[in-house]
Amino acid sequence: MTEDEKRRAGVLFFPGDPELKEIKRRTHNLNLDYNATYEDEVEKRAAILAEILGDLGEGSFFQGPITFHYGKHTHIGKRFFGNFNLTVQDDADVYIGDDCNFGPNVTIVTPLHPMVAAERTRLRTADGTERRLCWARPVRIGNQCWFGAGVTVCPGVTVGEGAIVGAGSVVTKDVGPHTLVGGNPAAFIKNI
């Protein structure tokens, strides 16, 4: 099983695998290209995003700067708005629905690392170099969600349609549809 097949299967994989590193390097360079554009370079920005992302719905806008890890594992619906410093570490798939709005400094993270150090570093190359391992869990965000500034979404989380996540929240568990959550860890505040 290749490292990419392991990644897709949700089992421990080596993110430093040359094939995976090449995909990430390409995406990281495209992030830099996007971040070097002016906001009025709409066509240039759209072309770069088309190269980075798995899917991007019409009418979407990214303030920039952006940081995608693989990019191609991120699927974004129509009329998405991403404010400054959007970071998506998409080792697993990330699905973002239509009409979502993200405040500045939103981070979506899909990789997890084993809690036991020996498991994180259990594989070594012939020269003794540690191969740090991780696995990844997909993140799903429904339509019409709003994330305040500084929200972090952790691996494996699903955020229901119409949910609002308050500024500075760390979302470690699923969020129900049409609810307001906030805090660290994010907790239910009320139905909306």
Residue locations for each model-derived region?
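Short secondary-structure boundary/capping segments
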Residues: 4-5, 52, 130-131, 137-138, ...
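Flexible, glycine/small-residue-enriched loop-and-beta-strand segment within the central core
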Residues: 66-76, 81-157, 184-185, 190-192
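Terminal amphipathic alpha-helical/low-complexity segments used for targeting or macromolecular assembly
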Residues: 1-59, 115, 185-192
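Residue-level recognition of short, solvent-exposed, well-ordered loop/turn junctions
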Residues: 8, 140-142, 176
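C-terminal/domain-terminus segments
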Residues: 152-182, 186
